[in-house]
């Protein structure tokens, strides 16, 4: 993460320039962390990096904290109800950074620490793709964002269609909520089962 230090930020920027020269697509998960930097610094740095990004992942407060773009009011109990402002925020990212051809976002309505509804939306060009809502009682809320990003990249490499891609990605994310510790130790078949059944209770 470029939040670690100025030298790390410069290294990231050099890598992004290299990617652009070689035509390599770049995925960025904004994933703001208040313990690592303040919002002003984050926005200055991320605005310098975003012109090299082709796919951006932005969730909850990431829009405003990392880019100064409003999409979410901070109320985690009604995240899914705010889908229209999420859409507007995603479109604003592509307007401000025209190199960014796609934006993905996870929406959550959390009723307790463990219980909540999860879904995702995916913008490519001017077309939105939405997933079903998954109701989840989390075993451990760690790594769901990483699981989402990893699944999204996996589907992009497989060149799956956008709807399948985002459905697979949110299924991987909610499945991770049922697994302890950092790693999403599941198979592609496990994730597909969740996609088809909307049931995150893992059976192997």
Model-derived segments and their meaning:
Residues 1-128, 134-135, 187-193, 202-204:
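Ribokinase/PfkB-type carbohydrate-kinase core domain
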Residues 129-198, 202:
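Conserved post-catalytic alpha-helical subdomain immediately downstream of the catalytic base
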